[in-house]
Amino acid sequence: LISFHRKKYVKINLKKFKSKRDGRKSVSKSTNSEPADAEGVPSSSKEEIIRGLNDDLAREYKAIIQYVVFSSTLKGAEYGDIAEQLKIHASQELSHALELARQIDYLGGDPTVKGKEAEYSGDSKTMLEIDLRAEQETIKNYRERIRQAEHAGEFALSEKLRTIIAQEQDHEIDLKDALGLR
């Protein structure tokens, strides 16, 4: 790699630099005996966050599948509007999954490739109830993940999760409206 430095060409030996993952190895800066990362956050905190984010990612995969299937199989004129909304929800859930995978990688983890098992019902109202319960569970999980992220000093992550949770709450509102619960 060649870069400019004070109008001179400078060669940089990239072999001297550690890889992104190598830079994430534990160093002991914490006050207890638990290994910590370079910022002094106990590695178990980040591992817990990564596990939680992977669980959230698996739920997003499930949501994508359910929204795609349900938007295509809802029956009845009264469900036309929500069927269109579910298509939008599916694309938003994909955006959430992409962001979660990015954050998991940033924290040094490997994003899961396995989703939670999708649910199905042939009854339109039951499909929406399934989605509503899933959204409510997801919101609860993201609130916990925000708490964990802030405790670990991962404030950018907590802000990303707040953006995601706002969309999940919009999904909850759409589903409650479609079910006549609001």
Predicted regions and their residues:
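Iron-associated oxidoreductase/ferritin-like identity signal
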Residues: 2-182
